Amino acid sequence: MVLSPDEELGRIVIFFLGCAFRRDREAGTIEISQESYIRSVLERFKICRTSSIPASPANDYRSVKEDEDAGDVPFREVVGSLMWIANQTRPDISNAVRAVARHSHEPKISHWKAAQKILNYLLETAHLTLKFNKEATVDVGTLVYVDADFASKATDR
């Protein structure tokens, strides 16, 4: 665990397991970010293009026999990094990561390109955080709306 001052906001930031925790007592908020970890993953896998969506809607990432093997690419390393990011602070990429992780045993070029597209999306959205606020207007517990099945299978719609 590392403590460091967040000079532009005047708050203390705690870094723990790749996550930055920012607490603002006055506003009653806690923010969790993985921007520095995401940037290190993007640098490690040499990602420089951006994407506005994590997955292509028409692609269901089935194992296509005609598709060539991905060869000697760090597919499992990328999938592991993406799973860590999705599980900690980025539920928006969970479905896309699940779709490519299914093919870790025998990745094809299309699966490698799909994993790179998720990384491209993270480059575009690395600044996003999870923000928790103590001010609740309605006491309903945690209320979340998510399209977790975005672009899963076009044939099921």
List the model feature ranges, each with a label.
Residues 27-29, 33-157:
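Divalent metal-binding acidic/histidine catalytic loops
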Residues 1-30, 34-39:
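Acidic, low-complexity central loop/insert segments
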